[in-house]
Amino acid sequence: MIVQEPVLQLCRAVSEAGGRALLVGGWVRDYLRGCSSNDYDLEVYHLEPDVLRHLLETQGTVNPVGAAYTVYKVRLRYQRRSLVADVSLPRRESKIGRGHRGFVVTGDPFMTFEEAARRRDFTINAILFDPLTQEVIDPFNGRADLDNHLIRLVDPATFVEDSLRVLRAMQFAARLEFTIDPQTMAHCREIDLHDLPAERIWGEVEKWLLRSARPSIGLLAARELGILEQLWPELQSADLNALGHSLDLAFEETAPLDYPRRVTVMIAILCRNFTLGIPAVERFLDRLSLHTIERYDVRRQILSLVTHRNLPFTWSERAVTDGDYRRLALEVEPGLLARVESATCPDQRMIVDHFLDRVRQLGVEITPPPPLLLGRHLLQLGHPPGPRIGEITRAVYQLQLDDRVHNLDDAIAAARSFVQ
C-alpha cells in the first residue's frame, strides 16, 4: 500500500520542523494485512501544539475537533486533489470517573511511542508506522497478533476503564474475522456496559452489521462478551447460529441498497423473532437511538417488517389480489420484506421470489401507486373546500388500488358518483 502524496508532504513538513509524524490505528493495521485504506490517522511527536497548528494551516484547511487534547481534521491539498487526515498529538488520559466518558485527555508531544500506544484498545491497533522511513514500531507485538488473527487487549489495567471497548471487540471480531483472546474475553465480561449512550452503541453496531462480510461472528462474540446479557436480552433466547446465518445472507443481499435501507433490513432480521413482539422491538430500537436516517423512517419500516413477517408465505397459500399487494405497499416496502424473509427462510426462496416478482410487476416494490385524484382536482371542478374532499379522494384511491380506476378521467368520474 502506498501512502498518498499529500500525507507524505505533511510528514516531510513535520520532519523539517523538528517533529515526527507517524501513522497509527486502522491504516497501519490494514497496511500490514495487505488491505487498502484511506483512513489516515497521524500522531505528531516533538512539536508543541501552537507549532503544529501553524504547520497544519500551511498544508490545508484545519478543523479542530478536540481542542483540549489537540486533534485536527485536516483537508490536505495536493495539485488538484485533496483528502482528509486526522492529526493529533499523542494523548495522555487520566481516569476521573466511571464509564467511557470519565477521562481527562491532554496532548503531550513528548510521550514515548510505547506510552502513547499503551492507551489504545487492542495490540493490532497499537502499531505505529513512519511513512518516510517505512519503520514499523510495534511495542506490544501487534504484528504477531495480526498474523495469528487474534484480538488481544494492550493493557489490562487501562482496558477496563472504557466500556465501549467491549463492543469494539465484537465488531473487530466480525470485520476482521479474528478470534478474541480468552483473557481479553474475560476482562470484557467484567465490564459494566450500562453507562454507554445509545449513539455510541449504534456506532459499533453499525460497523458490525454493515462492514462485516460475516456478521454471524460478531453475534456469537456478543454472547461470549456478555453484550447480549447486558444490552440485548431479547436475543439471548434466539438460535444464534440460525440468526447469524440470516445476517450473513442479508449482508450480501443488501449490497445494492442505499444505506438507510441496508440498516433497516439488518436490524429487522435481528428483531424479527423477538418473543415479546413489537414492544420489545421498540425498546431495542430505543437502545440504539434508531429513528430516521437521511430522512428515511428506518424505525417505522423496521416495525412494519416485523409486523408483516411470514406474509409472503401465508399469501402463497391463498388467493391474493393486486389490490392486496398495492395496499401492503402503503404499510411496508414489499421489496425490503422480501429481502428479510429470503435471508431468514432461505429454504423458501422460491416463494419469496414469486412474491417479489409480483410486486415488481405491479410497480410497488418500494412505494405504493401515487393517487390519480388529488384535492386540487376537486377544487378545480368547483367542489367546496372541506373535509369531504379528503373523504372522496381516499375513496377513489381505494378504487384505484383495486384496478377499478385507471386514469384521471376515471378518477373524476368516480368522484362525481360520490358527490351525487
PLM feature spans:
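Catalytic cores of the polymerase beta-like nucleotidyltransferase superfamily
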Residues: M1-Q420
